Swiss-Prot record:
Gene3D superfamilies: 1.10.530.10
A biological-process GO annotation: carbohydrate catabolic process
Subcellular location: Cell surface
Pfam families given in the database record: Lysozyme_like
Organism ancestry: Bacteria, Bacillati, Bacillota, Bacilli, Lactobacillales
GO CC annotation, single: cell surface
Protein name stated in the entry: Pneumococcal vaccine antigen A
Entry-linked InterPro entries: CwlT-like_lysozyme (IPR047194), Lysozyme-like_dom_sf (IPR023346)
Organism: Streptococcus pneumoniae serotype 4 (strain ATCC BAA-334 / TIGR4)
Length: 204
């Protein structure tokens, strides 16, 4: 009886893993449809941003499933949901990322600080420049709790549950109105996911 239950559980785990892999593969395929557009817009701009990073950010933001694929409305207008077409979203997103990358270079901080600043805002780059010059989860969490959240009304440190393969090892929560302090790590993970799936698709 126990062996049968164990087999069922193992089968269930394999089926779930297979389903998740299929969903991730579909999401990667969706994001990769924007590759020509990303490449074209990058060629128009003087930017240190690269194609792989931008695609990973699209995957992180929307998986390519919304009009504002890079969720760049707020950086353009100060309000959300004001950009509805993909090209404008990507163009604005790349402009914002470019500004962050140049500022990060000027301040002598790492590239992942610039990526995290896409979620937190460019002031995060100054914060990291004054605190070791390298983006860490501890510093991102501190900035979320002490700067972003209070600025947007959460002065009590209130949190909410946030389940993600990265967050489950670090408390599985975020601060209300505090942005996403896992953002740069999610982008990095998604960068590898896209590379792996595209490599697999090419070799297949």
């Amino acid at each position: 009886m126990f062996k049968r239950i164990r087999r069922v559980l193992v089968l269930a785990v394999f089926l779930f893993a297979g389903y998740k892999a299929y969903r991730v593969h579909q999401d990667v395929k969706q994001v990769m449809t924007y590759q020509p557009m990303v490449r074209e817009i990058l060629s128009e701009q003087d930017t240190p941003a690269n194609e792989e990073l931008v695609l990973a950010m699209i995957y992180t933001e929307t998986k390519g499933k919304e009009g504002d694929v890079m969720q760049s409305s707020e950086s353009a207008s100060g309000s959300t949901n004001t950009i509805n077409d993909n090209a404008s979203s990507i163009r604005q997103g790349i402009q914002t990322l470019t500004g962050n990358l140049y500022l990060a270079q000027k301040k002598g901080v790492d590239i992942w600080t610039a990526v995290q600043a896409y979620n937190f805002g460019p002031a995060y780059i100054d914060f990291i420049a004054q605190n070791g010059k390298e983006n860490t989860l501890a510093l991102a969490k501190q900035y979320s709790r002490e700067t972003v959240a209070p600025l947007l009304g959460n002065r009590t440190g209130k949190t909410y549950s946030y389940i993600h393969p990265i967050s489950i090892f670090h408390g599985a929560e975020l601060y209300v109105n505090g942005g996403n302090y896992y953002y740069s790590r999610q982008v990095r993970l998604n960068l590898y996911i896209i590379k792996c799936f595209t490599l697999f698709s090419t070799s297949g």
